[in-house]
Amino acid sequence: MTATLERRQAQGLWDRFADWVTSTHNRFYVGWFGVLMIPTLLSATICFVIAFVAAPPVDMDGIREPISGSLLYGNNIITGAVIPSSNAIGLHFYPIWEAASMDEWLYNGGPYQLVVFHFLIGVFCYLGREWELSYRLGLRPWICIAYSAPVAAATAVFLVYPIGQGSFSDGMPLGISGTFNFMFVFQAEHNILNHPFHMLGVAGVFGGALISAMHGSLVTSSLVSETSYEESQNYGYKFGQAEETYNISAAHGYISRLVFQYFAFWGANSRSLHFIMAAFPVIGIWFTSLGISVMAFNLNGFNFNSSIVDSQGRAIYTWADIVNRANLGMEVMHERNAHNFPLDLAGTESAPVAVSTAKVGG
């Protein structure tokens, strides 16, 4: 019998790079999506930090009245932001080479587009990287599906909404006060609080938080005690141990007795329980993202502009009227120099600023 030995061919540089990129033994999994994710997120982060600290004022409304957003121009951590690109730019792609000078690019809010586009590409790649690592480890794809909820939300406020409104100046500013300003203006223009998709999102986030708190407290409370009465119950569990030490039947029985017998049907086994925990907030945020996307094209929330009137034709004010007045007030205040008279106020009869209160003791 003859044995033939062949010398193993040395791997080329590309093959070694590919093995390193796709290796699941690295402390930090890179992956092919990571090859694009790392530079885009680094670019977005570096540009955001520089712009947040030192960017000059930006003519966001396109009326030659720049808005200061950086720390060096008088803002603090709360009021600072990367200001959206100018309304004069609209939806045009505005990289550095499209401007006549760096000063012009900064004045028109070019850093906002740079940060947003690189950030969106980065989070898309992070989602793909989650799928890629799950695939290589033989896991199911639910991790990246769950992550698609915040990705959809970011895409809605940074990309879909500006496209629907016709300008990146309507995108969400990259700062704390800017985020709240975006929320107020969104409520004023679209009445998002009365949109059913937003209601589903609120139910999903709050319901998910409730389920998470219930689950964590139940698991912690139903640890199997493997200790004697003289020892602390905490000695019955070692942090990081492989085997389960809690009793799901005990937790299930607790919930069924605490509320009612059939309430805990979805927690009858670990799979159904954790599916509900994942699906509840994810589906809610999906609906909120979809709601922002349809309101981007002015398919707005419900409005109750027609007040209830009595037999004499006098208005009977409801909470809907209070919300309408608040919306009008917020719309008057935002972009007050660009819009001297908002259209929905100019086209109707003047309305009192406040609802009159009943006389006391009269």
Curated annotation (Swiss-Prot):
Q: Which residues bind [CaMn4O5] cluster?
A: D170, E189, H334, E335, D344, A346
Under PROSITE patterns, the record lists:
REACTION_CENTER (PS00244)
Please list the residues that bind chlorophyll a ChlzD1. H118
Q: Which principal EC class is assigned to this enzyme?
A: oxidoreductase
| Single Gene Ontology MF annotation | chlorophyll binding
Where is the site described as Tyrosine radical intermediate found in this chain?
A: Y161
Sites where the protein binds chlorophyll a PD1: H198
- Propeptide at 347-362
Q: What positions does the entry give for a quinone binding?
A: H215, A264, F265
Pfam families, per database record: Photo_RC (PF00124)
- Localization terms from the record: Cell inner membrane
Q: Which family does it belong to?
A: Belongs to the reaction center PufL/M/PsbA/D family.
What is the designated name of this protein?
Answer: Photosystem II protein D1 3
Where does this protein come from, organism-wise?
Gloeobacter violaceus (strain ATCC 29082 / PCC 7421)
Q: What is the lineage of its organism?
A: Bacteria, Bacillati, Cyanobacteriota, Cyanophyceae, Gloeobacterales
